Amino acid sequence: SLFELGKMILQETGKNSVKSYGVYGCNCGVGGRGKPKDATDRCCYVHKCCYKKLTGCDPKKDRYSYSWKDKTIVCGENNPCLKELCECDKAVAICLRENLGTYNKKYRYHLKPFCKKADPC
């Protein structure tokens, strides 16, 4: 769910997911999808593509369990869809951390209508 995703992003990046990524670029947060503005935005594009592959669970609402061991996210689920959902969220949180250097405040409140059409997933 969005709750676990936000928690993972905070653990990996030290940033509040809603304030920092809620409307960042063309792909982060709610709304459309478009050509990524930078590496940070590309993390969110890949994340949305990951969600599109899920079948049998709702990425925004369904809760899953994970643990934080030695500064590492460990997904733990018996349900295959929830495990994949956790892995999607883990991947974006790590990607955002790895690309903190590309985070550009000018894209923090980027208007989605100005986004160019993205390539399909």
Curated annotation (Swiss-Prot):
Please state where this protein is localized. Secreted
UniProt keywords, alphabetically: Disulfide bond, Myotoxin, Secreted, Toxin
Chain positions of site Important residue of the cationic membrane-docking site (MDoS):
105, 108
Looking at the keywords, is Disulfide bond present? yes
Q: Which GO terms describe its molecular function?
A: calcium ion binding; calcium-dependent phospholipase A2 activity; phospholipid binding; toxin activity
**Where does this protein chiefly localize?**
secreted
Distribution of this protein across tissues and organs: Expressed by the venom gland.
Superkingdom of this protein's organism: Eukaryota
GO CC, sorted alphabetically, is:
extracellular region
Q: Where is this site: Hydrophobic membrane-disruption site (MDiS)?
A: 111, 114
- Segment Important for membrane-damaging activities in eukaryotes and bacteria: which positions? 105-117
A Pfam family this chain is assigned to: Phospholip_A2_1
PANTHER family given for it? PHOSPHOLIPASE A2 FAMILY MEMBER, PHOSPHOLIPASE A2, MEMBRANE ASSOCIATED
**Member of which family?**
Belongs to the phospholipase A2 family. Group II subfamily. K49 sub-subfamily.
Name of protein: Basic phospholipase A2 homolog blK-PLA2
The source organism is Bothrops leucurus (Whitetail lancehead)
